[in-house]
Amino acid sequence: MIDDHGNFDTLFRHAVIVDGTGAPARIGDVATSGDRIAAIGDLGGAQARQNIEADGLVLSPGFIDAHTHDDALVLGGSAMEPKVSQGVTTVVTGNCGISLAPLVLDSSPPAPLDLLGDREGYRYARFADYLAEIEANPPAGNVAPMVGHTTLRVATMDSLDRAATQDEIRAMSRLLEESLQAGAIGFSTGLYYPLARAAPTEEVIDLLSLVSRFGAIYTTHMRDEEDGVELSLLESFDAAKRGRVPLVISHHKCMGSENHGRSVSTLNLIDEARTRQAVGLDAYPYVAGSTVLMDAMVRKSSRVLIAWSKPHPEIRGRDLSDIARQWDCSVNDAIERLSPAGAIYFHMSDEDVHRILAHPATMIGSDGLPHDEHPHPRLWGAFPRVLGHCVRDLNLFPLEEAVRKMTTLPATTFKLKNRGCIAVGNFADLVLFDPTAIADTATFEAPRQRAAGIRAVFVNGKTAAIDGVVEQARSGRVLRRAA
């Protein structure tokens, strides 16, 4: 706050201000007081407790990770190092139909719930209890939580290989309503996965009518991102339109070599839908994805790395084909012996990834899996990879546009009030970085590596990281759905 002598808390001097709106960068000073941005402009005569000389450095809003599985990472006063170290100040959780709450498990979580962690994490009968635990021991960054459809199915159904009955939909609706009342910003589905694959569109629409009543958002890991990707897009548009909710297509991609190039068609479909309804999408800057180990995904991939394996933890980080050769067995037999497990799948093309990233409606979402023993490098490197590789090296789009995709666009999409833009009165979530040096250093071989070029990160006005090293402050907040 401003003290009795008119001093600010923090003053960034002579920064290259990229405000998040897509407007051209400009040189100026930015001052913070308490948890807010207090002044912007030529503040040459101003005083502050902390002065940061930012000549040649970009000051932008803190990055908003539009697609995460950080539901467990944010608990226990977490440093959130994989995210904060790369400039992320807010994470959107509860994606792909899976959230830790509202669900209590007495046995190991079935896939894909195991992507979030072990049984111990599923201990919240109410979504409000989960949010209360985050607030009681805050993490380093902000949390914008969603509730997952698959989580609701597991909580209310005795068999998941069928459509929900009307009684089960009513039970899911009660849990969903409680979650939205507690502050969930949206609802997600993961119709690709076995636990939700049997859910018909009508089941989703029944639940979306409740989401609409609360003014919340719908995000989906679609039923098919392979041969039927266009049909799945049409299903998603139809569900959102009939449910009267804004839609986000999660980690949009075209999987499998036979589908490379289809992003021309899928993005045209998205553009057409956007003339009739609110549709957004997120993506990450890699040709490989990651999820649970499944034969169907292996068949679509040119290479598969094992991220974790319950029966064989020593195998993590190794190529599936090498494992099969070592064990003198088929790839299918190796999959069976490794499961339950997670994997990294190389199944996209650079051209599709770049085309999708460049689309004006695309937000950046890491889709990282912090529970994985050998995670995909996107967990640590997605945002600096966009700013370094995509912007500086490939010139896919201007720096200002990249920052918009990471800040104002997700803040607007998810209704995160007073965040995502450098403006007086907004929350002081800020990142200072060197545009000539910012880069991802995490690789598929060594994924747990901090980004280069991130000089400072502030969350709600407090220093969260300096030169990539997370500080002691735990100033993150739960960002509940705006009324």
Residue ranges and their predicted role:
Residues 1-28, 33, 84, 296-483:
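Active-site microenvironment of metallo-dependent hydrolases
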Residues 60-67, 92-95, 217-222, 250, ...:
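Active-site neighborhood of phospho(di)ester-bond hydrolases with catalytic His/Asp-centered motifs
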Residues 76-185, 277:
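Divalent-metal coordination cores built from histidine and acidic residues
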Residues 96-97, 192, 222-224, 252, ...:
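Short, ordered loop/turn segments at secondary-structure junctions
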Residues 101-108, 154-160, 201, 230-234, ...:
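Short acidic, glycine/serine/threonine-rich loops at helix termini
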Residues 163-189, 195-338, 344-363:
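Histidine/acidic residue-rich metal-binding segments in metalloenzymes
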